[in-house]
């Protein structure tokens, strides 16, 4: 995402927002991935081509105009907004990719900056990412944030922290008692496909969906948590009954593997987990996640 953008917060919860589809595929990341893919394909692989759609067929498609049953009202603007979490009193926490967390009141229109945000590695698709509230937030005030951080030798990786959102000072919210509970393994070069989406289920298990960082192979590597869907306790410890819990290490975190860039994650009314994954120049996927 380049420059500043405006987030239109609607009075209606759209499915796209619930899936968190507000990520952006950076141009440089797409170019790098295209080059990596060419190198990754061996000369003996056969690629199937499909005929172009006939233009006359396209022109014959029947369309129907539907009455608009909702209204969109812009109530606030943010710089590169990435995620939003709504408190029980209606106030909104909005992450901004460059490293700011805003607390916005849609009634008073007051927007406050939250203090205590960790330093993020801002660039490419990296920065401050997702934010979600603990299911028992009203009692424990735990907020979970994901973000990109710099490592050694120009390597980067995603991190998840847990912190308490201190609202005792009405005009100065802040994060206290921060604890790092998860990180991508390993850190790699490049700043694409962090994904790092967060969601809690009904049992207060934390699900994390990290991307494969445009490196292909880690998505199938059991010694890496890149390109996976992970299931953890609320303190970051791997949850019992995970399919590879007996292997220990990073493998114990894994619920599902072989993912690319999971930018949307949501549970449906049947408590089934769905993940939306961004494809390369098309080919996006909506996947029902089941135990590996």
Residue ranges and their predicted role:
Residues 14-19:
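Hydrophobic helical h-region of N-terminal Sec-dependent signal peptides
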Residues 2-13:
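Bacterial N-terminal signal peptides that target proteins for export
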Residues 106, 163-173, 230-240, 289-292:
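Short loop/turn segments immediately following beta-strands, especially the blade-tip
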Residues 25-216, 272-279:
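Acidic, Gly/Ser/Thr-rich repeat motifs that build Ca2+-stabilized beta-propeller blades
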Residues 98, 156-157, 219, 223-227, ...:
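A detector of repeated loop/turn-to-beta-strand junctions in beta-rich toroidal repeat architectures
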Residues 21-23:
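C-terminal motif of bacterial Sec signal peptides marking the signal peptidase cleavage site
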Residues 186, 191-193, 241-264:
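Short, surface-exposed recognition loops and adjoining beta-strand edges that mediate ligand/DNA contacts
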Residues 250-290:
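Repeat-solenoid scaffold signature
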């Amino acid at each position: 995402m380049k420059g500043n953008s405006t987030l239109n917060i609607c009075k209606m919860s759209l499915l796209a927002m619930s899936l968190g589809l507000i990520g952006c595929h950076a141009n440089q990341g797409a170019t790098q991935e295209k080059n990596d893919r060419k190198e990754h394909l061996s000369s003996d692989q056969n690629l199937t081509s499909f005929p172009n759609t006939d233009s006359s067929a396209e022109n014959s498609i029947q369309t129907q105009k539907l009455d608009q049953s909702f209204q969109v009202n812009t109530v606030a603007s943010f710089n590169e907004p990435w995620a939003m979490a709504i408190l029980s009193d209606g106030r909104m926490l909005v992450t901004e990719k460059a490293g700011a967390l805003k607390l916005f009141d849609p009634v008073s229109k007051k927007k406050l900056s939250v203090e205590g945000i960790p330093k993020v590695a801002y660039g490419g698709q990296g920065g401050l990412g997702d934010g979600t509230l603990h299911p028992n937030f009203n009692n424990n005030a735990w907020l979970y944030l994901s973000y990109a951080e710099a490592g050694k030798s120009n390597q980067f990786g995603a991190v998840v922290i847990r912190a308490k959102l201190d609202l005792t000072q009405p005009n100065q919210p802040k994060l206290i008692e921060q604890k790092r509970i998860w990180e991508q393994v390993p850190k790699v070069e490049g700043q694409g496909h962090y994904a790092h989406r967060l969601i809690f289920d009904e049992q207060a298990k934390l699900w994390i969906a990290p991307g494969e960082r445009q490196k292909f192979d880690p998505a199938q590597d059991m010694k890496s948590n890149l390109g996976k869907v992970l299931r953890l306790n609320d303190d970051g410890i791997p949850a019992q009954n995970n399919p590879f819990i007996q292997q220990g290490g990073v493998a114990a975190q894994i619920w599902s593997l072989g993912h690319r860039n999971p930018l949307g994650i949501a549970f449906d009314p049947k408590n089934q987990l769905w993940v939306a994954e961004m494809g390369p120049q098309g080919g996006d996927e909506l996947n029902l996640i089941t135990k590996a």
